[in-house]
Amino acid sequence: MIEPARLESVEISRAVRLRLHTADSIEHPASAHVVVPPCALTEAVSSQLHAARRAQVEWSSHPLKQRLKILKSLRQMIAADPRWLASTVDRDNVAETLAAEILPLLDACRFLESEATRILREKQVGNRGRPMWLWGTSVVLRPEPFGVVLIIGPSNYPLLLPGIQALQAITAGNSVLIKPAANCSGTLEALLQLAARAGLPSSVIQLLPESPDAATAVMQQQVDKVVLTGSAATGEAVSRVLADATTPSVMELSGCDAVFVLEDADSELVSNCLLFGLTLNGSRTCMAPRRVFASDHQADEILRLLQAKLARRERQDAAEGPVAEFRDARPSKLAALKIREAISSGAAMLTGFIDTANGQPELHGVAILDRVTSDMSVAQSDLFAPVLSFIRVGSETQALQEYAKCPFTLSATVFGSPQRSQQFARRIDAGCVVINDMIVPTADPRIPFGGRGLSGHGMTRGEAGLLEMIQLKAIVASRRWFKPHLHSPTPADADVMEQLIRLEHARSPFHSLKSIPRMIRATLAQMSFRRNRTLTIGSKDSLNSELRTP
């Protein structure tokens, strides 16, 4: 009979495997890895974890300058032949891979080379803000690595996302275990080959098997931090495993990203950006547009332009040959179900079609829906398929109210005049807001990226992403001789503390000055009590000594 605690652990493990295989909308169901028995897999992962811990101790002792030198060498090797590394990514469009994965990865690497020394240096805290009663206290903030960081990678950007996260982790002095998405080990193996040639010591970065069991096993053996890019369902399952050991994590999860079209927006620009966002990487991008909030006038004009441009793009693609289909049909099937529900509730499907030839509904093409409402499931789901819903609103305030009905708050886009868009962007609850463009500006390596709500927590990339890879240690040095808290209590202590509070926190300098005489009197009384106590104790000790003398 299985004990209740053991049974619960087994069920959690099953849940994680299920989420990593099926509920994570950015992983393929098939896997190229060799199936390893769970016991053997656990032993193999344990060996990798121990090797990572040993490597981390030595790696963290290397000066930061030396670590960054290796990163620079790696960057230059990739730049010398970027097509070779791009060819290892399972994507037909090499130009898109170079633009969406290789170039941002190199930019992030150079950002670390130039900024990591500033970000990771020990900082002496200034005296400003120090309480008066703690004069003489000095504080140094020292960044230290976590230890071993587990990175669970996605399949939509299998090189860029885990690659940047791994580089940030090792820059901070951690070692890294990467669990690749299914069929994505090859590109990361290529990256690690280059890293080894650049001088990265063995076991500082290691690849785990693609099996979800590998991630589960290493989490149960308590890594020091987990960075996950995946669906909200995967994040929920992983969080349960991490809860027992209170392992910290960063989770970049699902999006249902919104586009806000203000009245003074350029409809031509909006339609161009929507077409780009819907078709980039087959719409398998967490920041892809899914909801458009616009007035009737703007919606009509944008829909007219967007449909014409989409039709032109489809004719162009047809003339150039068949477009490769992604192997994972699950996102298309889920999208088809959500679209059908929306149509039955009054939405209109303007482009794309649903095919039922295989017995199950499946979306084909880009689906543009009009007359969608925020309570429809299609506007509240983390779809990983080219689906765009137009939600018509009468005001900016209504747009924000409708937007808030969705639990996903990863990123958003605003179109309008610069000043008005800047003001409106500050009212949006999202981790990142882009103005008058879409997705591409977020490749800037300075920009931190992270979601809120069901879209995750913590940050990746930029300075904030690097700081996620360290834990701060505060080193506090006290004054050498004045430590009144070590004295024995006296009846005057409360008076002294009261006047100290009045002195430091009075409503004006005048009232602070009024507290000074009272503070002096209370302090003198305190000193008098202590002096009298010392004399009394001394007299008693002398008397006892005389009584003991024969």
At which residue positions do the language-model features occur?
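Structural signal for hydrophobic packing residues in well-ordered secondary-structure cores
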Residues: 56, 60, 75-78, 82, ...
